[in-house]
């Protein structure tokens, strides 16, 4: 194991990336005042250094992501600068959002204002499950519904395979309980706009001071107030990543794998097997998944979307394909794919082009 301290190098975590600069938070055990020599007293503790990437890393194509564990050398304590010399191996990597070494996803929804929408929640849960990370579900604005209503929602989600934590950022209900699940982990917070994600981060981390958007009355969605990915240090250890808001996650998973993103379906497959190994659980005989579970209709809709997405990718990869697909809104936050004709092939020929063709024809006859 490399002794980074002996070589004058430091270990840290990339907490933000902007342009070609990387903000690196050094490990506390390597950030003791006695080891930092002429460290400027105005630097935070543990110190944050604004770093560049070594040319060697650029040449070998080594990208640096938020969440990366990195080796920093030649620290300039007075200027708060440094250089990233190496990137340690990642144990997980997300592409959207682009973040490394995540341990879990904190999914935040509101139970009221806007009301909880099962289809939208299910879509976010599927996307979270597809990362193979642990999923923690928090339901905000619980002060707006009764305890009886909370119990009904809880029972329903337990049937889905999730035990929600009811919180109220406004009234400070159970926010400390939610914070305990985040200690000593890198957590990505996600969910639709307007449900209180930024407010929750502001509650958990006073230094975050994120801009908070109100819910838009027209679409019952909040304004997208988060512009870039950033990790915030939690008081009890751990880092929390706020990600740029998105309304509907893409259903870009492999159709054959989709069923495993439903915990209630995984339970069925754990005790029995379908007759066919490539069963998609629609109308195949002797299927052990198809049945009277609540989200089965969600599964069928998501399966259609996943198949359409996969078909679109195959057709885009085939330059000889004359049939493309385009996304068309169905309303209620849903979309479907339909054939798209190639404009060049089916576009009406202009009169100018027709005249030029006739002139060429006359010349050929002469």
Range-by-range predicted roles:
Residues 3-8, 61-66, 74, 89-94, ...:
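Helix-rich effector regions associated with P-loop NTPase G domains
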Residues 115, 145-146, 173, 247-249:
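Catalytic P-loop NTPase motifs of RecA-like helicase/translocase cores
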């Amino acid at each position: 194991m490399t002794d980074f301290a002996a070589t004058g190098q430091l270990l840290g975590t990339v907490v933000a990336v902007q342009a070609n600069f990387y903000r690196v938070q050094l490990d506390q055990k390597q950030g003791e005042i006695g080891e930092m020599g002429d460290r400027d007293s105005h630097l935070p503790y543990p110190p944050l250094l604004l770093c560049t990437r070594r040319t060697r890393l650029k040449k070998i194509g080594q990208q640096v992501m938020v969440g990366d564990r990195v080796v920093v050398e030649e620290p300039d304590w007075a200027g708060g600068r440094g250089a990233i010399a190496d990137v340690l191996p990642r144990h997980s990597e997300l592409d959207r959002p682009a973040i490394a070494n995540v341990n879990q996803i904190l999914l935040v929804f509101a139970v009221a204002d806007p009301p909880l929408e099962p289809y939208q929640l299910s879509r976010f849960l599927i996307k979270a499950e597809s990362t193979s990370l642990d999923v923690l579900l928090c339901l905000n604005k619980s002060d707006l519904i009764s305890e009886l209503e909370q119990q009904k929602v809880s029972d329903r989600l337990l049937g889905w395979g999730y035990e929600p934590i009811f919180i109220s950022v406004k009234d400070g209900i159970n926010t400390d309980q939610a914070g305990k699940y985040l200690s000593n982990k890198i957590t990505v917070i996600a969910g639709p706009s307007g449900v209180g994600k930024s407010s929750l981060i502001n509650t958990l981390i006073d230094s975050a001071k994120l801009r908070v958007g109100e819910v838009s009355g027209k679409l019952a969605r909040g304004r997208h107030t988060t512009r870039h990915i950033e990790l915030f240090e939690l008081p009890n250890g751990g880092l929390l990543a706020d990600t740029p808001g998105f309304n509907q996650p893409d259903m870009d998973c492999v159709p054959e794998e989709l069923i495993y993103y439903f915990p209630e379906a995984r339970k069925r497959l754990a005790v029995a097997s379908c007759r066919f190994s490539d069963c998609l659980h629609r109308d195949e005989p002797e299927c052990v998944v198809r049945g009277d579970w609540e989200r089965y209709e969600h599964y069928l809709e998501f399966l259609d979307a996943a198949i359409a997405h996969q078909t679109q990718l195959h057709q885009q990869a085939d330059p000889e394909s004359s049939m493309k697909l385009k996304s068309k809104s169905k309303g209620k936050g849903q979309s479907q794919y339909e054939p798209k004709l190639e404009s060049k092939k089916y576009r009406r020929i202009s009169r100018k082009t027709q005249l030029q063709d006739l002139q060429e024809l006359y010349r050929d006859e002469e």
